[in-house]
Amino acid sequence: MNSILRTSIPVQMISCTDTDGKITPMRFRFKDIDGSIISVTIDKILKREDLTRLIGIKYQCTAIIYGMEKAFTLQYNYSMHEWKMIEISQQEV
């Protein structure tokens, strides 16, 4: 594993929006610090948290990243239409 993870980075997201407007993240990719493109399929959404003043939503999730199961937090900003990975556990789940 030569790649090093950074946090608070933009991600390209594939998500599903149901007829009620509920957004469910499914897969994403990001560029790590050495420039490698990392693709991630979300295994489980542990928690969904609406942010105050309708600015966005946070998702605590788990997935296999670099061959290890990791817990991480994704954030979607409604006004910017932007997804970010804002934190990731350095330890395997």
Task: Name every feature range the model reports, one short phrase each.
Residues 1-93:
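Cysteine-centric segments in proteins
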